């Protein structure tokens, strides 16, 4: 049963309840040595699933619809999240930015692979279906389905970290490849990583990242859509921070881990049949190599990613201020300066999102894309602040991060609660319950296993650090910006030589130079 068939009304996207039901499809998910029967009820996934369901419910909230939704452009007469429709102007992109931000605030910026992330893939299908050649109609059909239903896609485009120095066709026992072609579709086998939150998605887009060595065997040159319930398709999940939080603590102890854990997984495909209508690129290395930029996704997803990070930094900035109120150090000049630096990082990413929209450029078929220079700047800068901000928090909050009882249960023990009330209270009249609550939230954000995973996530979000810098350089060269910068330096160099100024408006110094006299 297709996910869209769970809708009671075909003129709207899924509701939260319908989304959860659509995940109960027998998908093959493994964690802790066992197969998961139902991701919507399993303690490793259920709160993350409920958090995604909250996003879908927001699309039907009358108070949020003006910010979140537009009418579809597919002829259905329905409505959808704004980022699921192709932008046709700079103002469209600005409205999409605001819709992305509104959705992201529901998870305080802590869920990055929400349905709007891969809506950028759907937008590329709709704006430039001709890129896919013989599979153009497939692109059009998927754009329609993704938009009208709000389908939740993820992608798995990175090969496992095994022999990455070799071309894909030399690691044929690991990397995803064509096994055979049939009338019904193609049969594929192999593995991809890192399938973040795929356990809670409807489909995975399988393809190539931009920096991978592809080789010459066209059996590896594939891009297709794989249903999460396809026979032979399995996910092997990493440890669940949500489950650990539930087993060892409470929401008071782990308020982020216990609901926003987007579980990463190894995606394994064992002779999976991919119907022809799900194929987008087939045995075509040239198109695979060109897809990153020409397919549109790489020009669209940075808007969602930048806004999501900006929302997250809003949260972290305010949480740092609240933590400093707990410790009584907020009035210290040096501490205020540190907080000011965090505010500056936050401001930068919001400013980049403004620039992406305000300087948007026309693309193909009337579509508009975020400004290329701004999005490439975001990709280079995004890994930088997180470790820096974490270090600022550690320096300014200091022992407050660990001067905490083990659990909310300690507050329910009358033998120690009075002691905690005296010695673990906050500053300026803040009681111990509030102080502990705030600082446990901060610890979950930066010090827990969940927090550590997010640091790794932000550092590597856009892929190879070298590659994103090279792409930023190539953009400067291809846009003409590098030529303009070089021309400015050349103009400066041309205004003087070893004999003095070469431009008429400046005075040479022969009348005041003292060197001849001094050297006699």
Curated annotation (Swiss-Prot):
Keyword Cell membrane among record annotations: no
Enzyme Commission no = 1.14.14.9
Gene Ontology molecular function: 4-hydroxyphenylacetate 3-monooxygenase activity; flavin adenine dinucleotide binding; oxidoreductase activity, acting on the CH-CH group of donors
Gene Ontology biological process? phenylacetate catabolic process
The alphabetized UniProt keywords are: Aromatic hydrocarbons catabolism, FAD, Flavoprotein, Monooxygenase, Oxidoreductase
**Record field: catalytic activity:** 4-hydroxyphenylacetate + FADH2 + O2 = 3,4-dihydroxyphenylacetate + FAD + H2O + H(+)
Pfam families recorded for this chain? HpaB, HpaB_N
Top-level taxonomic group: Bacteria
Q: What InterPro entries does UniProt report for this protein, alphabetically?
A: Acyl-CoA_Oxase/DH_mid-dom_sf (IPR046373), AcylCo_DH-like_C (IPR036250), AcylCoA_DH/oxidase_NM_dom_sf (IPR009100), HpaB/PvcC (IPR024677), HpaB/PvcC/4-BUDH (IPR004925), HpaB/PvcC/4-BUDH_C (IPR024719), HpaB/PvcC/4-BUDH_N (IPR024674), HpaB_gammaproteobact (IPR012688)
Q: Name the pathway it acts in.
A: Aromatic compound metabolism; 4-hydroxyphenylacetate degradation; pyruvate and succinate semialdehyde from 4-hydroxyphenylacetate: step 1/7
Q: What turns on this gene?
A: By 3- or 4-hydroxyphenylacetic acid.
Q: Gene3D superfamilies given for it? A: 4-hydroxybutyryl-coa dehydratase, domain 1, Butyryl-CoA Dehydrogenase, subunit A, domain 2, Butyryl-CoA Dehydrogenase, subunit A, domain 3
Q: Where is the signal peptide?
A: none
The record describes the protein's role as:
Utilizes FADH(2) supplied by HpaC or by another flavin reductase, to catalyze the hydroxylation of 4-hydroxyphenylacetic acid, leading to the production of 3,4-DHPA.
Question: How would you summarize the oligomeric state and partners of this protein?
Answer: 4-HPA 3-monooxygenase consists of a reductase component HpaC and an oxygenase component HpaB.
| Family per similarity comment | Belongs to the FADH(2)-utilizing monooxygenase family.
Q: Which PANTHER family match?
A: 4-HYDROXYPHENYLACETATE 3-MONOOXYGENASE-RELATED
From the Swiss-Prot or TrEMBL record, give the protein name: 4-hydroxyphenylacetate 3-monooxygenase oxygenase component
């Amino acid at each position: 049963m297709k996910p869209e068939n769970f809708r009671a009304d075909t003129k709207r996207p899924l509701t939260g309840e319908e989304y959860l039901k659509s995940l109960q499809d027998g998908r093959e998910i493994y964690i802790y040595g066992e197969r998961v029967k139902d991701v919507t009820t399993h303690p490793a996934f259920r709160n993350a699933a409920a958090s995604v369901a909250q996003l879908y419910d927001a699309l039907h909230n009358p108070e949020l619809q003006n910010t979140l939704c537009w009418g579809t452009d597919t002829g259905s007469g329905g409505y959808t999240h704004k980022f699921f429709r192709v932008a046709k102007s700079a103002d469209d992109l600005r409205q999409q930015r605001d819709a992305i931000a509104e959705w992201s605030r529901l998870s305080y910026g802590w869920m990055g692979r929400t349905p709007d992330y891969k809506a950028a893939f759907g937008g590329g299908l709709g704006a430039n279906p001709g890129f896919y050649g013989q599979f153009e109609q497939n692109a059009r059909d998927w754009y329609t389905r993704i938009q009208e239903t709000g389908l939740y896609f993820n992608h798995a485009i990175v090969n496992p970290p095994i022999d990455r120095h070799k071309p894909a066709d030399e690691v044929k026992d690991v990397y995803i490849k064509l096994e055979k072609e049939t009338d019904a579709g193609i049969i594929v086998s192999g593995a991809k990583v890192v399938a973040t939150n795929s356990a809670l998605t409807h489909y995975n887009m399988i393809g190539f990242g931009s920096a991978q060595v592809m080789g010459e065997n066209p059996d590896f040159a594939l891009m297709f859509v794989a249903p999460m319930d396809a026979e032979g398709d399995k996910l092997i999940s990493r440890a669940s921070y949500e489950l650990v939080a539930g087993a060892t603590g409470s929401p008071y102890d782990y308020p982020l881990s216990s609901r926003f854990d987007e579980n990463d997984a190894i995606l394994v495909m064992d002779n999976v049949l991919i119907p022809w209508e799900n194929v987008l690129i087939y045995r075509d290395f040239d198109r695979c190599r060109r897809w990153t930029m020409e397919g549109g996704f790489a020009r669209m997803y940075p808007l969602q990613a930048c806004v999501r990070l900006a929302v997250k930094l809003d949260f972290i900035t305010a949480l740092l201020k609240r933590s400093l109120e707990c410790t009584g150090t907020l009035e210290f000049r040096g501490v205020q300066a540190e907080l000011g630096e965090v505010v500056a990082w936050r401001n930068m990413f919001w400013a980049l999102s403004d620039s992406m929209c305000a300087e948007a450029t026309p693309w193909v078929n009337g579509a508009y894309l975020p400004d290329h220079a701004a999005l490439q700047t975001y990709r280079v800068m995004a890994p930088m602040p997180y470790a820096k901000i974490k270090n600022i928090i550690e320096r300014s909050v200091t022992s407050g991060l660990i001067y905490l009882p083990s659990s909310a249960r300690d507050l329910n023990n009358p033998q120690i609660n009075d002691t905690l009330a005296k010695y673990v209270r906050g500053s300026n009249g803040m009681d111990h319950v509030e102080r502990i609550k705030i600082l446990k939230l901060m610890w979950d954000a930066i010090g827990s296993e969940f927090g550590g995973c997010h640091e790794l996530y932000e550092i590597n979000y856009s892929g190879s650090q070298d590659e994103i810098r090279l792409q930023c350089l190539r953009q400067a060269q291809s846009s003409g910006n590098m030529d303009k910068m070089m021309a400015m330096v050349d103009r400066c160099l041309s205004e003087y030589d070893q004999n003095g100024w070469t431009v008429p408006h400046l005075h040479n110094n022969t009348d005041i130079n003292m060197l001849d006299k001094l050297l006699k």
